């Protein structure tokens, strides 16, 4: 099963108590550098395993990892709650993720405020006494208090305004399971949805390309043939996550599917069928691979990953340490499973306009450069020309902000696409057009300007039709997979020939040129 070109591959990077990061405190110039170097090492590991989205815990328990006008510093960075570590950890993480072609989403823990006497809970309770409810030793923001929605929206607006985040990721956006419900379930869902809507509106008003996401309970509701065992998003904790996708309040979901077998697969398919064209990347409970946490076998997780890919879903690992510690070889498997780079699916429901293509590509022995006016660029490479930009295996750099790339260019061809903030790609700009014919002779198909000679069909190829497309990827004609194809109506130029079966699966067969003498 070849990796797809578009797929969300995610890690939750937990900062509370330094669970995933940091494992040392920033209290001096040297210790700041050490803390930052540890994060860079983790991000390098993520990138090598094909991860393209990092969810970093930004608001923890009424405390944060950036200088905020609303809430104090968390103690995970400096060792002292309320004390700055001497640098902006959120900005640093964003910059380092972007250098590696990865998105960074600010993970915002919404209602839980931690222990009643801890700094975050204590300060917010002092400022807004009626906003926090005590349940046992812990405090929770009251989902039935309208100020909860506006306060959390202000936090998310602050992050969106001040930082180049790619997403706002809401955690625990639901009623606590220990909450004594005094309203109907329908009213409870309205209360939670009101919080989501307030946050969505403030974020999108500032930057409509910033993705709204959350991590709902892994089972949306009971299914006709499978029971959720009393633990689901919709009925139990008033979390209408599928409705948020339908109504455009969420762009992406990371359901916490920390289950196996018939408690996983039917519910994963339900998320896929109710995605409403948005992005779903179920969270996988890889912490259960640790004997101290559970008794899972790595095959439990790898099978889940394979099925998710079959249904066009992404995957998210909870959490970072269990991933990079390679518990039961899960990191090694992910490197093989994600053997090629992947782009995050475009937000076509927000914007579907393709940006301008890059211009003036120049290739030298140690790299290539191009010109353009869009935020990001993707680079493709292969030994044949034109480079197939539909093939994920040809991706060599993604979400690149720079207009150049250092790479060995010997015996290689390149194509560069521009990409806007919504993930829409331009048509490709191909390199080496003048060198293409002699180098790629084995891929050149015979064409006399009227008839194209089709290559013999391999016995293993399931295809009844062929399609001709331009270098930009536009299909211009189709026909049966026979001995030859009439191309008399095609304009002069270079075209790509692809096979096509009834399921829409396509494979590149070669390329050809239409030339006619006057």
Place the predicted regions along the sequence by residue.
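C-terminal tail/sorting-segment detector
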Residues: 437-441, 447-450, 454-456, 492-518
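Pro/Thr/Ser/Gly-rich low-complexity, intrinsically disordered linker/stalk tracts
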Residues: 333-373, 423-437
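Active-site-adjacent "subsite" loops/lids of carbohydrate-active enzymes
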Residues: 6-8, 12-37, 95, 105-162
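Aromatic-lined carbohydrate-binding/catalytic grooves of carbohydrate-active enzymes
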Residues: 49-85
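Aromatic-lined carbohydrate-recognition surfaces of secreted/lumenal glycan-active proteins
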Residues: 103-115, 169-170, 188-234, 279-289
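Substrate-binding cleft of secreted/luminal carbohydrate-active enzymes
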Residues: 241-242, 246-264, 278-350
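Catalytic domains of carbohydrate-active enzymes, especially glycoside hydrolases
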Residues: 34-63, 162-167
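Beta-strand-rich modules
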Residues: 405-425
